Amino acid sequence: MAAIPSSGSLVATHDYYRRRLGSSSSNSSGGSAEYPGDAVPHSPGLPKADSGHWWASFFFGKSTLPFMAAVLESPEHSAESPQASRSPISCGLAPETMKKQPVMHPSQTNSRAPS
């Protein structure tokens, strides 16, 4: 059987990673003040997380990247459905290669029985 770690070790691991990421909130063991120069430096080319939960924008639709907002608001994308476009994706193949192969849509079924 696999050993299940105690809750104390899980809390210690969580506390360690909070300090490594430079969290400003304090906890019972002293918070990030014990490690003043240990925070991961912020790169000037990347957007800053506002609440410490960097993943929140993925779930709640808050776009922090300006180029994504420009793509989503462009007029060429507004007429199409947001799910998928009807044009085939070339994936770097030559145009003549794409013309030779039939385009299969998910709604089409295979009418031949396997032999």
From Swiss-Prot:
Pfam families reported in the protein's UniProt record: PPDFL
Positions with biased composition (Low complexity): 22-32
Chain segments carrying region Disordered: 20-46, 74-115
Signal sequence coordinates: none
Keyword Isomerase among UniProt keywords: no
Coiled-coil regions listed: none
Function: Probable regulator of exocrine pancreas development.
Family that this chain belongs to: Belongs to the PPDPF family.
Official protein name in the record: Pancreatic progenitor cell differentiation and proliferation factor
